[in-house]
UniProtKB/Swiss-Prot annotation:
Homodimer. GO terms for biological process: prolyl-tRNA aminoacylation. Its EC number is 6.1.1.15. Its main location: cytoplasm. It comes from Picosynechococcus sp. (strain ATCC 27264 / PCC 7002 / PR-6) (Agmenellum quadruplicatum). This is Proline--tRNA ligase. It comes from the Bacteria. One of its GO terms (molecular function) is ATP binding. Belongs to the class-II aminoacyl-tRNA synthetase family. ProS type 1 subfamily.
């Protein structure tokens, strides 16, 4: 490629709407252009990067025996209603674009393809002899993000590899899951990225277990908790830990005490001169299920701990059948306006007890008349604790479960693990924190979709069983931007060689010099012929502009046909290392070819 003939425009200033370094650099370097909110065009340089990432992904998938396919982006609502996810994706999470066709049929633009692939399996797989099967695609996906941000990191349109496997048994699924774990590690290593595999929440996709592959970067949206012995790592949404030991309560007898202006844990503990580990705090949540039913959930947890709302939503979803519902579409801490819709009286927020009376809820068919009471293990084990008295400016001290308060029967872990907690597998290990960008996610789905949609097979005895499923996703466009977030400097992008749009750029400082142009043309031809993908900067621009652009776009190796030509040499610069050296003209091709090959090992 010759830059003089290319659509190539760089910016000297950071775009105003770009927030993180990788987003700024991809815009400035002419890789992408914003078309609308969360919608970007992939320009020629970016498309080459995406093709290289896709090819690495494709090679690793094919090596496991997976078969590439292409599934429809338009998906009928009926198959999503059959799986039970239509309300979740169009109402609760609200991330699916939905539309109606001219026949008034309801459709969705695919954010994922479990329903489509299960429909295919239902129609085509009959016998255990056809199993296992593993299909994947690399395709554009659509998600109506509430707040698209960070360029390709969280867009409304993006490129993804999604794969789906079908099995006769959990054991067979686990083998494919392990194969995918290794394949994903291979993909990320080949792309030149530093990453960490972590336990993760399965979210709306569901299943019994999942693992995320996080690219380590300060701008990552996800927090990772891990131990230095490398035996535990998890997304905070999923992480478990041992909290610090509770300090013994100084209150040995039960009493109600006036505690003015102590609606927060901090102010209460300061007033009582006690540790927050002695306090049971009670957090009220308003839960709305997909059938419109509102339930008020009262969560009791130790005073120094916070509620993990992902864990809580998962538990509330399990309880949905108790309310003739399937899923949670809203989980909020109700403000004063929200309370007016269901509260029979003003609630003493900040002073609530675990026994807040059900008559606080006004009679309303759309609202459950009883509080759903859950207790976290950190609170369930406390003795002589402090908690609210259900009266503003009053708390009770020295309270105990079984005497002053009935212990809720639902004891579930809804605690947010955090850095500084002790590890479950080894309490001497302290959880550390890092930021990460989710580039891949693998799931053991089990029979969630096959049971819901009637996708079955017959075993060797002729007995019918639901197909056991797994699914495996890689964000191709996100991975490409994450590589930039992990590798850049003050001058621009530093692409890993494996996914750089080109391996080398030949820069002609003075295009009017016949000697410089002749040497550059020969190097350009010889390098490409040797398999070193090379662009030629033959623009009629100042040398300084060309050098700045070469650094900005992040091509790994730069060859300059400058002043040293008189000695039969050219300057070669390695972008990552930043070193410069003069090489004989006849040594350039072999040297760069060796560097490219070494980077791929």
């Amino acid at each position: 490629m010759r830059l003089s003939q290319s659509l190539f425009v760089t910016l000297r200033e950071d775009p105003a709407d770009a927030e993180i370094p990788s987003h700024k650099l991809l815009l400035r370097a002419g890789y992408i252009r914003r078309i609308g909110r969360g919608i970007y065009a992939y320009l020629p340089l970016m498309w080459r990067v995406l093709q290289k990432v896709s090819q690495i992904v494709r090679e690793e998938m094919n090596a496991t025996g997976a078969q590439e396919t292409l599934l429809p982006q338009l998906q009928p609502a009926e198959i999503w209603q059959e799986s039970g996810r239509w309300d979740t994706y169009t109402q609760a999470e609200g991330i699916m674009f939905s539309l109606r066709d001219r026949l008034d049929g309801e459709l969705g633009l695919g954010p994922t393809h479990e329903e489509v692939i299960t429909t295919i399996a239902k129609d085509m797989i009959r016998s255990y002899r056809q199993l296992p099967q593993h299909l994947y695609q690399i395709q554009t996906k659509f998600r109506d993000e509430i707040r698209p941000r960070f360029g390709l990191m969280r867009g409304r349109e993006f490129i993804m590899k999604d794969g789906y496997s079908f099995h006769a048994s959990e054991e067979c699924l686990k083998k494919t899951y392990a194969d995918m774990d290794q394949a994903y590690r291979n993909m990320l290593r080949r792309c030149g990225l530093q990453f960490r595999a972590v336990e993760a929440d399965s979210g709306a996709i569901g299943g019994s277990g999942s693992q995320e592959f996080m690219i380590l970067a300060d701008a990552g949206e996800d927090e990772i908790l891990y131990t230095e012995d490398e035996k535990y790592a998890a997304n905070t949404e999923k992480a478990v830990s041992l909290p610090v030991e509770a300090i013994a309560s100084p209150f040995n007898s039960f009493e109600k005490r006036e505690t003015p202006n102590t609606a927060t844990i901090e102010s209460l503990c300061k007033f009582l001169n006690c540790s927050p580990t002695c306090v049971v705090k009670n957090v009220l949540y308003q839960v709305v299920y997909n059938n419109g039913k509102t339930v008020l959930a009262l969560i009791s947890i130790r005073g120094d701990q916070d509620v993990n709302e992902v864990k809580l939503q998962n538990e509330l979803t399990k309880l949905a059948p108790n309310y003739d519902a399937k899923t949670v579409i809203s989980l909020t801490v109700p403000d004063a306006d929200a309370q007016q819709k269901w509260a029979a009286k003003s609630l003493p927020l900040g002073y609530i007890s675990p026994a807040l009376a059900d008559d606080c809820i006004a009679k309303n068919k759309a609202v459950s008349g009883e509080f759903l009471r859950l207790v976290d293990p950190t609170a369930a084990t406390l003795e002589n604790f402090v908690t609210g008295a259900d009266e503003t400016n009053y708390h009770v001290l020295g309270a105990n479960w079984g005497t002053e308060f009935k212990l809720p029967p639902l004891q579930v872990d809804v605690r947010l693990a955090k850095a500084g907690d002790r590890a479950v597998h080894d309490p001497t290990q302290i959880l550390q924190t890092a930021r990460g960008i989710e580039a891949g996610h693998i799931f053991q789905l089990g029979t969630k979709y096959s049971e819901a949609m009637g996708a079955t097979f017959t075993d060797e005895n002729g007995k019918e069983h639901p197909l056991v499923m797994g699914c495996y996703g890689v964000g191709v466009s996100r991975l490409a931007q994450a590589a930039v977030e992990q590798s850049y400097d003050e001058n621009g992008i530093i692409w890993p060689v494996a996914i750089a749009p080109y391996h080398a750029v030949v820069v002609v400082p003075n295009v009017k010099s016949e000697e410089q142009m002749a040497a550059a043309e020969k190097l350009y031809a010889d390098l490409n012929a040797a398999g070193v993908e090379t662009i030629l900067d033959d623009r009629n621009e100042r040398a300084g502009v060309k050098f700045k652009d070469a650094e900005l776009i992040g091509i790994p190796f730069r060859v300059v046909t400058g002043k040293s030509l008189k000695d039969g040499k050219v300057e070669v610069v390695r972008r990552k290392e930043g070193d410069r050296q003069d090489l004989d003209l006849d040594a350039v091709v072999a040297t760069l070819k060796n560097w490219v090959e070494a980077a791929g090992q």
